[in-house]
Regions:
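Positively charged n-region of N-terminal signal peptides that target proteins for export
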Residues: 2-4, 13-19
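Aromatic (phenylalanine/tyrosine) cluster motif
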Residues: 6, 10-12, 32
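Sec-dependent N-terminal signal peptides
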Residues: 19-27
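Beta-barrel outer-membrane channel/assembly domains of diderm bacteria
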Residues: 27-160, 182-183, 259-261, 354-365, ...
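Outer-membrane beta-barrel pore domains
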Residues: 62-75, 240-244, 249-433
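Active-site-proximal beta-strand/loop segments in catalytic clefts of secreted hydrolases
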Residues: 103-104, 165, 311
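Surface-exposed coil loops of outer-membrane beta-barrel proteins
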Residues: 116-150, 154-244, 322-344, 348
Length: 433
């Protein structure tokens, strides 16, 4: 059995025929791996996984009056769904490997089977549609979908993934149809490029269709970044985003992290701006989007972290189009932080605690946001309001393969000028294999 040694970007994995070892360098995971000269051996030594998940959601929101069946994120709703996820990725055949995954969901219960759901403004709900409360998070005609599936090339310095991939950056947090390139041929540097045609969700708690990120231009959305490490403590990152006819953006982020034994302390500062175009927010007539965020944190590796920070958005259109593919800036979980996502001139102060031991992990975020509603073109500025928000997550493993999860969101405080107060509870049970 002929084998070759390559560098790969993965963590520790072990099966009967091979071992993959990894080390962490400059925030990315790099390691040695066996690459096979035979396609058959690469496929035989791949790894498959799956899960069966029961997941439910209840929102204590506003009740519809009369025969009105239209609902939004603030409406009272409840549902229970079951889903099955399957995934496989091969070992490397020389410089190549493949990955494929699927998820299918079925509705077990809906509090209101006749409710009608629309997209609204929140970009976490792209082109939402459907009937019944489960359509809040699981679009009616998109309940059996291809998940993360791609072809990957890796030669030691360059990684290229093409297909349906998970994009993760300051302004991306979801699956996209596109190409992701990463290169580390320059000393102490990481160069990344991401091209996106469509984006969407295929998760146990959310399944949407995949929609064109730029219906006005066939070029799609492109992100490019350059990150440079200064010694072992500091790094600086510059990036740009182009989505022709909609917006262009640029940003810079500086970070510092010091480690001693198993403990660490760090801070980061980040600024970004969007330049809105003809089909951007307010058709580019109300200025540009802005983001400023600062974060400090301290923690113990693989056990606990405490962090706090500030986030501010632009005074006219908030983040503008920066959040087109989501973000990793907001400390709130995927269903929270609406005032920051949709409001303008937002000022968020927050604290966050994360803890994990054995099979139990939890996270809690508390934040207070002062913000205004977005004004239309030539409309006077709207008044400020404030909303306080707590997000809580508890993930506990009963056994190695059987686990449960609880998520809670609650908003309170302020005058409810733009959003009513609400409580949202998610419950899930997962059998992994």
């Amino acid at each position: 059995m002929a084998k070759r040694v390559y560098w790969i970007i993965f963590g520790y994995r072990k099966n009967m025929k091979k071992i993959v070892l990894s080390v962490i360098l400059c925030g990315s995971v790099w390691g040695y791996a066996w690459g096979y000269d035979s396609i058959d051996e690469a496929l035989e030594n791949g790894i498959s996984s799956g899960d069966i998940t029961l997941y439910g959601n209840y929102t204590n929101g506003t009740k519809n009056q009369g025969n009105n069946k239209g609902k939004n994120d603030f409406s009272e709703s409840g549902y229970m769904v079951g889903s099955v996820g399957l995934a496989y990725h091969s070992a490397f055949y020389k410089y190549l490997r493949v990955a494929v995954s699927f998820r299918a969901v079925g509705v077990a219960y809906e509090n209101d089977t006749d409710s009608i759901w629309g997209a609204g403004n929140l970009t976490n709900n792209p082109n939402r549609y459907g009937k019944g409360d489960a359509s809040r998070d699981f679009y009616m005609n998109d309940r059996t979908m291809l998940g993360q599936s791609y072809l990957e090339y890796f030669d030691g310095d360059t990684s290229i993934k093409a297909g349906r991939i998970f994009a993760d950056s300051e302004w991306a947090d979801r699956l996209v149809d596109g190409v992701w390139l990463r290169n580390r041929s320059l000393p102490n540097a990481l160069i990344e490029g991401l091209w996106v045609k469509n984006s969407g969700y295929v998760q146990y708690n959310k399944m949407t269709g995949f929609y064109d990120v730029n219906p006005h231009n066939s070029l799609g959305l492109t992100q490019a970044s350059f990150k440079y490490h200064i010694g072992e403590v500091m790094s600086v990152k510059f990036y740009g985003i182009a989505n022709p006819s909609m917006f262009y953006a640029t940003g810079v982020k500086a970070s510092a992290r010091y480690e001693a034994s198993k403990s660490y302390i760090g801070l980061s500062g980040h600024f970004a701006t969007s330049f809105e175009q003809t089909y951007g927010v307010q058709k580019g007539k109300e200025g540009n989007g802005y983001n400023t965020d600062v974060k400090v944190y301290v923690g113990v590796k693989d056990m606990a972290e405490v962090s706090g920070g500030y986030i501010g958005s632009g005074s006219n259109i908030g983040w503008g189009s920066l959040n087109t593919l989501g973000n990793s800036v907001s400390p709130f979980f995927m269903w929270g932080g609406r005032a920051l996502l949709e409001g303008v001139d937002a000022n968020v102060w927050y604290g966050k605690v994360m803890f994990a031991i054995d099979r139990v992990s939890f996270a809690v975020v508390y934040g207070s946001t002062k913000f205004r509603g977005m004004s239309m073109v030539n409309e006077p500025l709207k008044p400020y309001d404030r909303v306080n928000e707590v997000n809580f997550l508890l993930d506990f493993g009963f056994t190695e393969h059987f686990s449960g999860i609880i998520n809670v969101l609650n908003t309170h405080g302020g005058s409810q000028r733009y959003y009513p107060h609400m409580t949202n509870v998610n419950l899930g049970m997962k059998l992994a294999f």
